Amino acid sequence: MISPDRIKEIANSKPTGIFNATGGAELGVTAASATAITVDEIMDLFYSLKSPYRKNAIFVMNDATVKAIRKLKDGNGQYLWQPSISAGQPDTILNRPVKTSAYVPTIAAGAKSIAFGDFGYYWVADRQGRSFQRLNELFAATGQVGFKASQRVDGKLILAEAIKVLQQKA
């Protein structure tokens, strides 16, 4: 499972983000509106993902998108959003977990506002071990010692069909 601190890398183009036009996730559905999402579009996104990937799939979106979706109801007047009733369990949409990240684009014209899929197919690889450098002189005047650390990582969605995105109308 992808940790929340990796979402920023995954959502954006560092290294190869899921919302990138090249190397990113496949388009699952285009919303009819530039500023809203419907229950039908979420259903279409859900079923645009092939069945084998739905088993481990999660929804990833921005808090503002979550707010909009929490207001949606199905044809029977039931809210699509199902808050978790168990401590430590995530909220769900269509019985799939929902994760939020400030790094996923909000609902706006042309934005890819929701990702749904099996994020196990996004691989993050450590390119080399961490390196640490002790900085004795930098803080010598205050009697402190500083440290500088670096690590090289790379990531890529290795199977584009494992994650689908919902894109707002341009």
Where in this protein do the model-derived segments appear?
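Charged, low-complexity, helix-prone segments enriched in Lys/Glu/Asp/Gln
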Residues: I2-D5, V66, W123-A125
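Generic serine detector
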Residues: S3, S13, G24, S33, ...
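Short, catalytically relevant binding-site loops at active-site mouths
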Residues: P15-G17, A64-K67, P105
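Generic detector of short, locally flexible boundary/turn motifs and exposed helical patches
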Residues: N20-G28, D63-T65, A109-A115, G129-S131
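A beta-strand-loop signature enriched in Asp, Gly, Thr, and Trp
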Residues: T22-T92, V98
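Sequence/fold signature of self-assembling virion shell proteins
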Residues: G75-A170
